Every structure is written in C-alpha cells, then in structure tokens.
Amino acid sequence: MMIGLLGRKIGMTRVFTPEGVSVPVSVVEVHPNRVSQVKTAANDGYSAVQLTGGIKKSSKVSKPVAGHFAKAQIDAGDMQVEFRIDSEDAFTPGQVISVADVFTAGQYVDVSGLTKGKGFAGTVKRHNFRTQDASHGNSRSHRVPGSIGQNQTPGRVFKGKKMAGHMGNARCTIQSLELVKVDSERNLLLIKGAIPGAPGSRVEIKPAVKKQARGE
C-alpha cells in the first residue's frame, strides 16, 4: 500500500506545456516528512506508519507529545498523519521521506485538507437554493428557504434537511488530480487544478486510489 506525505498549500499559478497550453496548478510545499512511529499488527492490531511534518516550538509541545517524538529521535512537528501499510519492514522511526521518494511527475494523486471557512451562511450560498421572486407580492422573503416540513404528520423536520448554518472548514478530498511536476530541490509539488484550503493550510497528498498514471 502506497503512503502519502504532509505539506502546506502555497497558492495557485500556471505552467505552460511545450505546445503553449496554459495549465492551472496548485503549489504545495512538502518538506521532508519524518517517521514518528511505526505501528505493527502485533502491538497495535494493524500496520501503519505515522508521519510528522514541519517544526513546532518546544514550548508549545506537551510532555507526553515531546516524549513521543523523542522516542523516535526527531524534532516535534506541527502536522501529523497516519497511513496504513502492508509491511512495516520498509520504515523505521526517525526515517526521513522526501517528495522524490513517493511521487513522480505524471501520476495522479488525491489531496485532502480543510476547506476555507465561510462562517454562518444562508441556503442560497450554502446549498445553491434559488431565490424567490424579486417582486409580484413578495415582501422581504427573497432569500428565505421556504417550507422545511409537512404538517402534523410527521410533525418534525427530517434529519439532513438543507438549511442555513456553518459553511466550510470541513475536511474535503479531491481525487485523481494530475501531478504536473515534482521539484525535489525546492520540495514543491505542482498539482493540476484546485485543492482544498487556504494558502498556508495543511494538506495530505496520497497516490490516487481510482486512477493510475497514463500508460500504466
């Protein structure tokens, strides 16, 4: 099973193909990830590798967490993620994994992150509801959702009803994005299209589960 890496979204730009076609790409900075723990089926019930990225001030790390990183003889990170693996033999605590070890240009990846938070939003913005009439007897009800239920039967609002509420700041995964370029010198990945999150936010990049690179 392939593992992924942790990185930070830098922003978006574009690159040009040899034919002169403009390709929009998201730039992700992926500094070498460090293995903080290797979980085994014998000790933990399943096999997984735990990675950390970035650097966190020692004053911001609790003693139990500091001891966890010290056991692997690595600096405390400000990002952490776990990937399931088939065999623990390829990983050891303290091991450093770079972008060139996992990704190659042309393959497809899945990117997970937190979407931009939009705060409290109405149904028009949050769920793409249509607005009501601007005139013809409509008074101050242009953006209201309308009826949210039936009558005495069932006498309640069904779960999952689309209503106003908090929008964004939710985990989201965009699948099967093409990896345009891997810049191992600057620890950058150029991924075709948009990915979740604001610039500077944490993202997880994994080999795509539904699509392989061209020619494979």
From Swiss-Prot:
GO terms for molecular function: rRNA binding; structural constituent of ribosome. Residues 132-155 are annotated as: Disordered. One of its GO terms (biological process) is translation. Belongs to the universal ribosomal protein uL3 family. The modification N5-methylglutamine is found at Q152. HAMAP family: Ribosomal_uL3_B (MF_01325_B). Part of the 50S ribosomal subunit. Forms a cluster with proteins L14 and L19. InterPro entries: Ribosomal_uL3 (IPR000597), Ribosomal_uL3_bac/org-type (IPR019927), Ribosomal_uL3_CS (IPR019926), Transl_B-barrel_sf (IPR009000). The keyword Signal does not apply. Keywords: Methylation, Ribonucleoprotein, Ribosomal protein, RNA-binding, rRNA-binding. The lineage of its organism: Bacteria, Pseudomonadati, Pseudomonadota, Gammaproteobacteria, Legionellales. One of the primary rRNA binding proteins, it binds directly near the 3'-end of the 23S rRNA, where it nucleates assembly of the 50S subunit. It comes from the Bacteria. This is Large ribosomal subunit protein uL3. Pfam families: Ribosomal_L3. GO terms for cellular component: cytosolic large ribosomal subunit. Methylated by PrmB.
